[in-house]
Amino acid sequence: MIKTFDVLVVGSGIAGVYTALNLNSNLNILLICKEGLKDCNSYLAQGGISSALNSDDFPSYIEDTLKAGNYKNDLDAVQTLVSESKKNIQRLIDYGVPFDRKKDGSLLYTREGGHSTFRIAHVKDETGKYIMETLYERLKERNNIKIIEHCKLVDIIRKDNKCLGGICIHNGQEIQIHAKCTILATGGLGGLFKSTTNFPFLTGDGIAIALKHNVAIKDINYLQLHPTVLYEPDCIGKRLLLSESLRGEGGKLKNLDNEEFVDSLKPRDVVSKAILEEIKKHPDKPYVYLDLTHLDKNFLMNRFPFLYNACAERGYYMEKDLLPVAPAHHYAMGGIKINLYGETSLNSLYALGEAACTGVHGNNRLASNSLLEGIVFGYRCAKKINSELFVTNNSSYPSKEDVIDYLKERVDENYAKLLDY
């Protein structure tokens, strides 16, 4: 089966969906996702989304991001992220995202590890869910965007140094999708780890496909642990992340002797390392405690309803019980190398979100910068594609001959592998 579109978007997280929404409405767009539409890490995000409070906050926010990333960040990418944060948050508000607000109507901000001030917008403790639900509603209002769920990208179609679309499997059938532009927003690779905060099916598919075609990759060795994941010895795979905002609102990390052993609001790598050092002292009890018992029950229930209930279901009550926590894989800072417009080293192939790497995070992402990265660079990517397709007179679809040539090469390659076997 062959389908033809102007733009193919692979991934239903914030990067893919936000980009699709900002592409011109006269473009014919296909968005596919490996599982269901809502099955993405963006939907799981709890703490919030960072934003510069105003232009005076730029230097501080830039420094916080650089410091968290151990100054291995790409400075241009960091400056872009920070300077374009507020206007993209406003776009989310315009879409209808119901961020928590103060009595005067202004945004209510929280603080997380590595931030020098309160600059994280949120919706209770399910920010990702509320953002994504809003974006999905806007997505379904767009007649020019077609969505196919449970559709797995297995390869891209390539001719010379240009991407011509993708090859997918849907309901057991192979589909060739011809597209002028292809966007890989396939998420991270947490599903490869035994202990992770990610969905198990997030296995770095987009990065693997890029590697196969010698598309440039950057900082793939930069992987992040989240310090506070609920310790459940019988749980394998996706675990319950206890948001950094719990510490931002006063939670403290304590060892088994009930002693505070680390500044709970240090960057994630620092806190994770400190926890692992504590765990080495008692390998039979591989956890430390997150202490929220000094906080008011009603505050905890109202500010963190999802986490309060999730912990209660497991027999822990935040206002009276110490919560056992340990680090788990959370995020990949590296990925497909892109510029500030999402362009990869292969023409007409773009990448965004956790699958991509601008270098904005350095070797350790600052808390709540991931959702922001998705929308800032997603918006820039959309505008770049809009401009490219307009300037080139709507470009041209890959020719039948180009696609046939690629498929012949693919058949020959697989046949050679079979002979070798």
State the predicted function of each range.
Residues C181-D234, L371-I375:
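Glycine-rich loop(s) and the adjacent beta-strand/alpha-helix scaffold that form part
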Residues I148-E149, V154-C163, I167-I169, R303-C357, ...:
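A glycine-rich dinucleotide-binding beta-alpha-beta segment and adjacent secondary-structure elements
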Residues V7-L31:
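N-terminal Rossmann-like FAD-binding beta1-loop-alpha1 element of flavoenzymes
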Residues M1-F5, G36-K38, L44-S51, R91, ...:
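Glycine- and aromatic-enriched mobile tails/lids
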Residues I209, V215-Y316, K384, F390:
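An anion/pyrophosphate-binding glycine-rich loop and adjacent beta-alpha core
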Residues D94-E174, A185, V229-P233, L253:
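Conserved redox-cofactor binding core of oxidoreductases
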